[in-house]
Amino acid sequence: MRIDVLTLFPEMFSIFNHSIIGRAIGKEILKINTVNIRDYTIDKHKKVDDYPYGGGAGMVMAAQPIVDSIKTVKKENKGKVIFLGPKGKTFNQNLAKELAKEEELIFLCGHYEGIDERAYEYIDMEISLGDFVLTGGEMACIPIVDSICRLVDGVLKSSESYEDESFYNGLLEYPQYTRPPIYEGKAVPDVLLSGHHENIKKWRKAKSLMITKKVRPDLLKKYRLTEEDKKILKDFNKKL
């Protein structure tokens, strides 16, 4: 997968040189480029923003450097142009799965009070990280790109690494334990030490259901429960 990020702060994306994403870049499974929007402004002072027409607080990113940077990147990257903004569709795991199927993507990070409306003509999709305010699109872009990239084939060692994670299958993840078997008087559940894979699988599914029911009941409304799932939840409710 190739991703180009249009931003005023390319240095912020150096985080992708590390850990899982960094290794995938090293293996050429991923290619993540940053493009400095400021390099495309025709303003002699390298300005990329200006005061909004009609008045108001803050500054607005000008259309010209945004559009010119998109046009240049589009010569090599034919992917969708995704703007990180508050009016967009809220990002979730299902959208991450959908975008992970793409071979190329372009992300546009806004800043200041937003972007000139005329730049939207070159944008295919707008995504929001949530109902809160961030300093700039970079803050939203980093976790979104990370979430997408880890689903690309070959980035993780196996699909099992993400298929059991919270949200992937619609449930929160089960509790995890590692050595030592007893810490501060608290022991690892016996089932996890039993070596009985089927029982471990059932225990993990039960715990996922119980945790989701307790912490995020809204997720269960969207989840297709089996008869066994319903029995687990019924038993769990009796214990409350």
UniProtKB/Swiss-Prot annotation:
It is found in: Cytoplasm. One of its GO terms (cellular component) is cytosol. It comes from Clostridium botulinum (strain 657 / Type Ba4). GO terms for molecular function: tRNA (guanine(37)-N1)-methyltransferase activity. Belongs to the RNA methyltransferase TrmD family. This is tRNA (guanine-N(1)-)-methyltransferase. The keyword Methyltransferase applies. Homodimer.
